[in-house]
């Protein structure tokens, strides 16, 4: 069955994308954020005040639209109660093209509590508080180093980002002519110490800039004994020093080394969504390259396997946006079902003429592909996982496999 939290997150993200694409002609789109502890009577009273103030708007059309939007919200609030996380109303005259507008209302129950009451009127909906809820809070500091190079980065949610790359002036182990071995070794140790200090300062600057309540700790990667020398030398800021979690052997110290470090730390990070999703994609690829026949991809193949109950795990890209349309002839029995990708605000695709009789074709049904596949999974007891595009395998799922793949219970030959 579909994991409720991941499916709800997918639907929440899709709803925000739709709202982001809506525009008004003037400042006539209202965003109303109501916290869970706010009294409905107080909200209605404040909206009445906003309605009265809107009478001062010079443009007659804008005034009518703003007051109409406020009336629409008040009619919905009158008998309502505020859900446990609060509620958000997005209402207004949305520009639909051809010099026309349409009064629309979207109601959102957020996944996290609304903190502050807010009434906002503009030419677009105010989405920042809801968009912030999509951001992953947990952040890990990443550092990979040897005596030649170091890279500092952050792992936030599922995204790895490099912030600093440093190179050293540490001389090689072979000394130049005329230098005593002792003197050369002293200079080399000084250069190593200075480089470690530069690394510690740069990494501390990056890590301290993170909201510390969301900062889980630091992972250090590199060859031995370099990473151990660095960690023992207390080169981090004292607040960061306390948050070093573990050291891992990695071969690369450039940006690719950050990904290698995250993979090496997979056991420590096993509860992180990124690692769960990586393991699922790796399982799919293992089945795909083996001769087990227990991997399939492409919407049609996946759907056929779902219907017969053969799918163990359905993997769907978080960024997949597709609809399945049923097209029928207005004169004969011709019918066709096709899927197509869409973006918020897209209109229906052209239908054309019937290939059998030449009559006009019309779209008789349109369903969201993800919703439809998830519904079949619920009926069949199939597990559904949504995969982000913030890592290589997740990006491959969308770009190379069309956003839908499945791990099968048995080989069906489909």
Swiss-Prot record:
UniProt key word Ion transport: no
GO molecular function: translation release factor activity, codon specific
One GO term describing the cellular component: cytoplasm
Record key words, sorted: Cytoplasm, Protein biosynthesis
Location relative to the cell: Cytoplasm
Coiled-coil residues: none
Physiological role: Directs the termination of nascent peptide synthesis (translation) in response to the termination codons UAA, UAG and UGA.
HAMAP family: Rel_fact_arch_1
The protein's assembly and partners: Heterodimer of two subunits, one of which binds GTP.
Family: Belongs to the eukaryotic release factor 1 family.
Protein name as catalogued: Peptide chain release factor subunit 1
Organism in which the protein naturally occurs: Methanococcoides burtonii (strain DSM 6242 / NBRC 107633 / OCM 468 / ACE-M)
